[in-house]
Amino acid sequence: MILVTLFCICALVTSLQADARLSKRYVIGGCPSHCDKSMCPTMPKDCSTGQVMDHCNCCLVCASGEGEACGGVGKLGDPVCGESLECSVTGGVSYSATVRRRGKQGVCVCKSSDPVCGSDGVSYRDICELKRVSNRAQSLQQPPVLFIQRGACGTSLHDNPNSLRYKYNFIADVVEKIAPAVVHIELYRKMVYSKREMAVASGSGFVVSDDGLIVTNAHVVANKNRVKVELKNGASYDAKIKDVDEKADIALIKIDLPNKLPVLLLGRSADLRPGEFVVAIGSPFSLQNTVTTGIVSTTQRGGKELGLRNSDMDYIQTDAIINYGNSGGPLVNLDGEVIGINTLKVTAGISFAIPSDKIRQFLAESYDRLARGRGTTKKRYIGVRMMTLTPSLSKELKGRLRDFPDITSGAYVIEVISKTPAAAGGLKEHDVIISINGQRISTATDVSAIIKKESSLRVVVRRGNEDIILTIIPMEIDP
């Protein structure tokens, strides 16, 4: 009896296997251990929805389109949804291995219901409609329609508030907020052998009052003939230097214009923590409103650590890139508050800013000086343009000027401005200043330094082959 039963079971299994081979399909039991392409169903000639691999990753089948059947019992050749579609069983349940084992079929639905824009300039209901049109075009030997933008054609990021870019683009929000109050500063000097002006340096600054007060670095505006400020809208204005703290490297300049300006507010640098995001904005290499970002590396980097012997200030260290021309621009936190002035770069990834608490102190002291009528210390002025005499310049001048003296150092006088102390004292063009008040002069900077300190100058100049003594009394002017 047992032998008869075993024989019947074997016969039944053999019969089922034969039926499976005849139908070129595997029955319930899942995918085969080895892919036999001969068992795959025949691919129809017209497959407008595209071709995909079946669940067993063995047979290439014609993809089911939106609304068409998908899934099944997990056999070779079971219908599979096309690109951008997913198989959904009734009630929105996605097709899975568990559903497959239960032998349920589903319907292909689009993974996304959001509108999209195609390369043909047409807005589509969803990505699936675009793919369907693209496949149809390709079947007609036409170019495919490419998916180029989420959202309908002509829409922007603000039309899709659920976008991750819209939600987390906080750096761009900060820049948009602060950029109108950041200015580009150009410094001009007259050329050596003509009265034409040329730009010799540039920097950045930011507006702190709507009537045109601008904060920048002292070194940006120091020793320049003319300071010009360019706003974000391209308008340019000459600026006056109102106050300077050379030790702290902070300067206050002002432009006069009829309209009110957007301003930046100061944050509290004392509240900064290492690791906070910061944004540096300025005009490196005269490229306006260039933005770099980084974090606060440390909030208290001593000036003496940086080799600044006369500095008792702590600097903010950041890895936000600060380049030439960024100097004077703001370093801001994510609230758009200024927490420092971009000041110097040591190397890539190591830059420093003057803390905003120091700026606040400078502005308070400056206000106090202006309120008392003292303002900035008057600048001593003699009315001369000069440059440092070097051996190469001396050689060049000897070739041009027949009576130029045999001298290779000093301050060479390029121009004496009429009706100034220098003109009244007898200084002339092509003179070489070699000493003032008994101090030897080697550079033009030496002359400027003495003028700042002395109210009367006993100047020795070399003119031709003679040394001539002149007395010049500097006048005081607003800087």
From Swiss-Prot:
Site entry (Involved in trimer stabilization), positions: 168, 170, 277
What EC number(s) does the entry state? 3.4.21.-
EC supergroup of this enzyme: hydrolase
Q: Where is the Kazal-like domain?
A: 96-155
For the keyword Cell division, the answer is no
Which GO biological process categories is it annotated with? positive regulation of apoptotic process; programmed cell death; proteolysis; regulation of fibroblast growth factor receptor signaling pathway
Cross-referenced Gene3D superfamilies: 2.30.42.10, 2.40.10.120, 3.30.60.30, 4.10.40.20
Protein name in the entry:
Serine protease HTRA1A
Source species of the chain: Danio rerio
